[in-house]
């Protein structure tokens, strides 16, 4: 690779060529952002915002049968210690300001998972005067988990999709 003319060559191709050459010698070429994203996916701390029946299924993910902590996903009680907020259940107009306040207390980068039909779009109570038709009207949502209520497996799948999304996208500047 030394002495080769790489003018106009895509950055990714150069990185792959250097990686191939250095891997034989026991080195790994990466960026600081990739290392930070890798570490962040292995230590996601989620906080519950359980509003209805979906919260029961959300609790199941921490129990021995599903054990979300084996994926590096652990619950936290404080929004200031959390990376992920899981909104589970029917969000009412009266509860919406509290949701936004808790979201604003979370440190950057922060992620939101909308769990269940009610959090995704109002669900069964969609046409009620007191229900917000989706928590994405109050906070930006990264992952939607469908179902009424979604199973613990569906939530685990959503959490793993969030880990993949974090690895795929840069999170230093959001």
From Swiss-Prot:
One of its GO terms (molecular function) is quinone binding. It is a peripheral membrane protein. Its cofactor is [4Fe-4S] cluster. It catalyses: a quinone + NADH + 5 H(+)(in) = a quinol + NAD(+) + 4 H(+)(out). Binds 1 [4Fe-4S] cluster. GO terms for biological process: aerobic respiration; electron transport coupled proton transport. Keywords: 4Fe-4S, Cell inner membrane, Cell membrane, Iron, Iron-sulfur, Membrane, Metal-binding, NAD, Quinone, Translocase, Transport, Ubiquinone. SUPFAM superfamilies: HydA/Nqo6-like (SSF56770). One of its GO terms (cellular component) is plasma membrane. Its main location: membrane. It is found in: Cell inner membrane. It comes from the Bacteria. NDH-1 is composed of 14 different subunits. Subunits NuoB, C, D, E, F, and G constitute the peripheral sector of the complex. NDH-1 shuttles electrons from NADH, via FMN and iron-sulfur (Fe-S) centers, to quinones in the respiratory chain. Couples the redox reaction to proton translocation (for every two electrons transferred, four hydrogen ions are translocated across the cytoplasmic membrane), and thus conserves the redox energy in a proton gradient. Belongs to the complex I 20 kDa subunit family. This is NADH-quinone oxidoreductase subunit B. It comes from Ruegeria sp. (strain TM1040). The lineage of its organism: Bacteria, Pseudomonadati, Pseudomonadota, Alphaproteobacteria, Rhodobacterales.
